[in-house]
Amino acid sequence: MRFSPKRVDRGTALLVECMKTEDGDKVLDLGCGYGVLGIVAARRARCKVVMTEINARAAALARRNLELNGVEGEVREGNLYEPLTHETFDTIICNLPMSAGLRHVFEIIDGAKGHLREHGSLQVVVRKGSGRVEKRMFEAFGNVETVAKRGGYRVLVSKMPG
């Protein structure tokens, strides 16, 4: 697993720019790494943020970064949705871990439906050339929109029906 120790990677930066949340939303930063997406959501829209991370070192960094940035949030260690039981969210944000393989990425997409509220959205960033990811999001949700493209990355959004 790789982290960007000195700067936010380009994909995460693009998702930060495009992320849509409302005041008071409950947001899940799935596979949060050191917490950039969740921290931005908490600061921008005063969201209730839950972050999950399987890597103990990254989870510890996310907790520390929440503290350093003076924002509320909860970091739970575990794989993907496992630490969440039956919780639901208004928004799930994720920098899809393409290096983990499509099977893992598809688990993220398919699992999102069980953790999104009515009208909730899955907002992800992925490397360009990810037609199979876009197709899977459409199959899972019946919709997918490319909201941004830059530097080899795309931000894709699918929404739950209401």
Language-model features and meaning:
Residues 119-126:
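Conserved beta-strand signature within the Rossmann-like core of class I S-adenosyl-L-methionine
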Residues 106-118:
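A short glycine-rich, Lys/Arg-flanked "PGG" loop and its adjoining helix->strand segment in the class I
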Residues 127-142:
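Conserved class I S-adenosyl-L-methionine
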Residues 91-103:
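A short SAM/SAH-binding and catalytic strip from SAM-dependent methyltransferases
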Residues 10-94:
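Conserved SAM/SAH cofactor-binding pocket of Class I
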Residues 53-57, 104, 129:
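Short beta->alpha hinge that forms the Motif I/post-I loop of the SAM-binding pocket
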Residues 1-7:
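Class I SAM-dependent methyltransferase Rossmann-like catalytic core
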Residues 149-162:
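Core SAM-dependent methyltransferase catalytic element
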